[in-house]
């Protein structure tokens, strides 16, 4: 060996020992020699001795260059078949050599698609994958960190010592290493050394499972092997238009719906108790439910209530309960607070078996600064903008994704596909879209940068959202993509090919604010604010709107829905019932937050659970019964949902009676031509002879009344229905002479089979 080669070996050994080597394959593993022989070099820090096992041969390996580089000469290329017997710390074990597996994991096409931002299944390459290479089982680790000086895998496999498993840098800033013999369930992180010599320990951005908070390591976890039973559901979903279907969503937070006692642990399939995950310091005796327990309790509850979908506040991994899940660190993993990825799959599968769709909140707008997360990932601003004027949400303390970087955009778009592909979810709600669309969002003058045209629109975020929605519907045509967009940005729910953002639903924030402002008023003053309850119809067909009363309206001192209402307790319940009924009969799909379905009194608390004891009291039972019946009515009457986004589906009868705070309208369905008449009285004053015009003579059955006694009302009504009279009003020749209960909403349906003879009262 020449002095030059010896100097190289000494330098390489020093770089390996100091975790500074970016190409260990150049030194380690089988190395061809000029004379046709091969030298095998094994990197074994702190080993006392290593024996090469090649076929039937055993030969001791020497350390001519460094005490941790063991080598032996062989006549032919040994491939990957050889093993090493390692003696370290008084313990002997055998293993395959990680640096014998030299073939690229990321192929040329993978790298090309990733670099241009179009690898829709990049998670199949990135991250930790249990697989076989050359017939040898193990785990392939793959990471994107283009600015790193070196990267090592650390974890249970090497006592968290970054010297043991340095990764190989490939083209495009990709780092790879196959660790043979590594089993699932192992904890790991990446130790990243920057060009300046700083060392960071990062969780895997593409990790499929992570430790339970407060621990932050990634967990080697498989993707395959779960047996789905929802093929029919998925086929039906993707062959139909969700906008033509009834959608009533139960928004919820899994960790605060209900808790279990910490001394009653979840029992695994093998009979062993699972370590409880504490609910909160404020409830030391409580634990979080597991995904299987939630499936047993939540799914029957939601089905009994009649909701069509569950919307889960973020179930991606997050370190801080107080973020409600909106500060994500594990984008490709369901949170381990409630169990394993396969247990979450089973939860979704059971939802589908019971006819319930699953929507998750997706947060591509920002991410937290936690040291184990994406922030300053490889010593540079890799995932975020370097300039804080476009890279930080100062008010939230989070960082903003750099949507102009192809690989970052690919990370997010593929993540969207991942949740539909791997977990069979049915929809997403994108949080805080307005914060993405505007560069000056929550920023004073001088603390934001204009776009290339001098405007405040974030054109990069617009292009990202368009790409994400285009790719989503390309792969999953029956999906729901819901925007929480609080401004008047145009064409949010229009297709991307005509310049829209590509969502198919948008939360109607204007409707929500107008309704709550109206219902919080003393009923006497409502006559001066009639516009609040009628204005939404003027713009409701500009987008595909979803009406939402969400978690944001029952926190931070806003009180819960029931306590927003004026008056005594009876009026509070009646107002709540009237608001929900108006919501269900107004055009647009529906979402309410957990607890509203039975009149929760307290604000939502992420560290608590719902006030289930309230269901011991009749008024709360009444609200719950009404919501059950509302959902039943809603799903059974296509006039309430078929033409939500067509002007044919709604027609005012009278929206101008502000003196009485009464409105009346029709919901119509184009396929069958059926219609419903809706009449609402938003004051505590009942009316015994209130006339409402209708388009067709006949008998109108009262099919719903929020004032029914079973809901906690005064039981005023119209004896099941009324015939019309030839009394012209509201532009119609026939009308109904109705009794309007206080603070109520009623629904009538024309019944051509019933007699037109007057009903005796």
Curated annotation (Swiss-Prot):
GO terms for molecular function: 1,4-alpha-glucan branching enzyme activity; cation binding; hydrolase activity, hydrolyzing O-glycosyl compounds. One of its GO terms (biological process) is glycogen biosynthetic process. Keywords: Carbohydrate metabolism, Glycogen biosynthesis, Glycogen metabolism, Glycosyltransferase, Transferase. Disulfide bonds: none annotated. It catalyses: Transfers a segment of a (1->4)-alpha-D-glucan chain to a primary hydroxy group in a similar glucan chain. Its EC number is 2.4.1.18. It comes from the Bacteria. InterPro entries: A-amylase/branching_C, Branching_enzy, GlgB, GlgB_N, GlgB_N_E_set_prok, Glyco_hydro_13_cat_dom, Glyco_hydro_13_N, Glyco_hydro_b. GO terms for cellular component: cytosol. The active site is at 431 (nucleophile), 484 (proton donor). It is an enzyme of class 2 (transferase). Catalyzes the formation of the alpha-1,6-glucosidic linkages in glycogen by scission of a 1,4-alpha-linked oligosaccharide from growing alpha-1,4-glucan chains and the subsequent attachment of the oligosaccharide to the alpha-1,6 position. PANTHER family: 1,4-ALPHA-GLUCAN-BRANCHING ENZYME (PTHR43651:SF3). Monomer. Belongs to the glycosyl hydrolase 13 family. GlgB subfamily. HAMAP family: GlgB. This is 1,4-alpha-glucan branching enzyme GlgB. It comes from Synechococcus sp. (strain WH7803). The lineage of its organism: Bacteria, Bacillati, Cyanobacteriota, Cyanophyceae, Synechococcales. The gene is glgB.
């Amino acid at each position: 060996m020449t002095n030059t080669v010896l100097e190289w070996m000494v330098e390489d050994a020093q770089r390996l020992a100091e975790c500074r080597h970016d190409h260990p394959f150049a030194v380690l593993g089988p190395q061809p020699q000029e004379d046709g022989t091969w030298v095998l070099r094994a990197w074994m820090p702190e080993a006392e001795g290593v024996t090469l096992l090649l076929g039937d041969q055993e030969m001791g390996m020497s350390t001519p260059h460094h005490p941790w580089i063991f080598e032996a000469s062989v006549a032919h290329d040994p491939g990957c078949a050889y093993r090493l017997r390692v003696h370290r710390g008084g313990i002997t074990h055998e293993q395959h050599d990680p640096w014998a597996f030299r073939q690229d994991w990321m192929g040329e096409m993978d790298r090309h698609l990733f670099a241009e931002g179009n690898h829709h299944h990049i998670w199949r390459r990135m991250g930790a994958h249990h697989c076989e290479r050359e017939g040898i089982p193990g785990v392939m680790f793959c990471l994107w960190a283009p600015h790193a000086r070196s990267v090592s895998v650390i974890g249970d496999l090497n006592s968290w010592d970054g010297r043991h498993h340095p990764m190989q840098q490939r083209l495009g800033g990709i780092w790879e290493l196959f660790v043979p013999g590594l089993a699932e369930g192992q904890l790991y992180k990446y130790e990243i050394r920057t060009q300046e010599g700083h060392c960071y320990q990062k969780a895997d951005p593409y990790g499929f499972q992570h430790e339970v908070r407060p621990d932050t390591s990634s967990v080697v976890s498989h993707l395959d092997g779960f047996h789905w039973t929802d093929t029919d559901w998925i086929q039906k979903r993707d062959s139909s238009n969700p906008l033509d279907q009834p959608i009533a969503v139960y928004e919820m937070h899994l960790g605060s719906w209900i808790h279990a006692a910490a001394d009653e642990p979840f029992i695994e399939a093998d009979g062993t108790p699972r370590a409880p995950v504490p609910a909160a310091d404020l409830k030391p005796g409580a634990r979080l439910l597991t995904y299987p327990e939630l499936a047993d309790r939540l799914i029957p509850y939601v089905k009994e209530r009649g909701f069509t979908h569950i919307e889960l506040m973020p179930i991606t991994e997050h370190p801080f309960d107080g973020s409600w899940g909106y500060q994500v660190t594990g984008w490709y993993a369901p949170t381990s607070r409630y169990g394993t990825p396969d247990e979450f799959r089973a939860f979704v599968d059971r939802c589908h078996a019971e006819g319930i769709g699953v929507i998750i909140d997706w947060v591509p707008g920002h991410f937290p600064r936690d040291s184990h997360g994406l922030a300053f990932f490889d010593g540079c601003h890799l995932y975020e903008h370097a300039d804080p004027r476009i890279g930080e949400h100062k008010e939230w303390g989070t960082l903003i994704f750099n949507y102009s970087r192809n690989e970052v955009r690919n990370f997010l778009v593929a993540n969207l596909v991942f949740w539909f592909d791997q977990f069979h979810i049915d929809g997403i709600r994108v949080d805080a879209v307005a914060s993405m669309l505007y560069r000056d969002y929550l920023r004073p003058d001088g603390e934001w940068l204009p776009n290339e045209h001098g405007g405040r629109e974030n054109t990069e975020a617009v292009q990202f959202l368009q790409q994400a929605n285009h790719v989503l519907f390309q792969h999953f045509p029956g999906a729901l993509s819901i925007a929480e967009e609080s401004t008047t940005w145009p064409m949010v729910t229009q297709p991307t090919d005509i310049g829209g953002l590509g969502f198919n639903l948008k939360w109607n924030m204007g409707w929500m604010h107008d309704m709550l402002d109206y219902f919080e008023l003393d009923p006497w003053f409502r006559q001066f604010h009639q516009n609040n309850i009628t204005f939404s119809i003027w713009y409701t067909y500009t987008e595909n709107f979803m009406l939402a009363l969400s978690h944001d309206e029952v926190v931070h001192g806003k009180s819960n829905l029931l306590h927003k209402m004026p008056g005594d307790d009876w009026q509070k319940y009646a107002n709540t019932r009237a608001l929900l009924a108006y919501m269900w009969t107004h055009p647009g799909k529906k979402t309410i937050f957990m607890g509203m379905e039975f009149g929760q009194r307290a604000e939502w608390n992420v560290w608590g659970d719902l006030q289930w004891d309230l269901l011991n009291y009749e008024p709360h039972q009444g609200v719950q019964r009404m919501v059950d019946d509302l959902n039943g009515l809603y799903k059974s009457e296509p006039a309430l949902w078929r033409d939500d986004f067509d002007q044919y589906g709604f027609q005012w009868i009278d929206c101008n009676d502000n003196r009485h705070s009464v409105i009346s309208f029709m919901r119509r369905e184009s396929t069958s031509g059926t219609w419903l008449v809706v009449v609402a009285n938003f004051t505590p004053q009942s009316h015994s002879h209130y006339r409402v015009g209708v388009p067709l003579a006949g008998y109108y059955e009262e099919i719903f009344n929020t004032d029914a006694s079973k809901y906690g009302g005064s039981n005023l009504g119209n004896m099941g229905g009324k015939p019309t009279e030839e009394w012209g009003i509201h532009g119609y020749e026939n009308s109904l002479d109705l009794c309007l209960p206080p603070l109520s909403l009623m629904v009538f349906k024309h019944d051509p089979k019933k007699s037109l003879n007057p009903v005796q009262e």
